[in-house]
């Protein structure tokens, strides 16, 4: 299955139609559907707080890790902006895992852990980079992974 941001956001639109809101939290980041974990990438950029987390847009279980994206002006009311990162490249084909965000002037950088499955069946974690000039549309670096598995010390997990 090839993951893309467009495919993930379409899945969210379809699955959200079946979600019952009765017991959903009011003061917590929450996607329209799916699974979230590991809030990360918290930063202040262009007048808003941005928060990202690992997100599965296809089901309410841990799998298919993408990055979900929210913003807030007051840290109380959060707006959902869909998928920021999808595992759509060979170096992150098995998931876009946790990382962080850096606001540097007019650019917002996301550093994340790209996971790929090797020929030996093991999952390898490496550090990857994406950037945005508007805080919402991210482009992955042509130099990814910026810290590949080969450069990591023996026994490290990224």
Regions found by a protein language model. Give the residues of each.
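Beta-rich carbohydrate-recognition and catalytic domains
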Residues: 1-158
């Amino acid at each position: 299955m090839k993951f893309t941001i467009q495919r993930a956001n379409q899945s969210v639109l379809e699955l959200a139609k079946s979600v019952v809101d009765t017991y959903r939290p009011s003061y917590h980041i929450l996607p329209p559907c799916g699974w979230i974990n590991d809030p990360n990438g918290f930063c202040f950029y262009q007048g808003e707080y941005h928060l990202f987390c690992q997100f599965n847009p296809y089901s309410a279980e841990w799998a298919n890790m993408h990055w979900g994206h929210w913003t807030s002006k007051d840290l109380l009311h959060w707006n959902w902006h869909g998928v920021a990162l999808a595992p759509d490249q060979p170096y992150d084909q098995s998931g876009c895992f946790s990382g962080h965000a850096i606001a540097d002037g007019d650019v917002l950088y996301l550093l994340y852990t790209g996971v790929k499955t090797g020929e030996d069946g093991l999952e390898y974690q490496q550090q990857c980079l994406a950037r945005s000039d508007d805080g919402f549309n991210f482009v992955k670096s042509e130099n990814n992974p910026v810290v590949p598995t080969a450069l990591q010390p023996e026994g490290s997990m990224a």
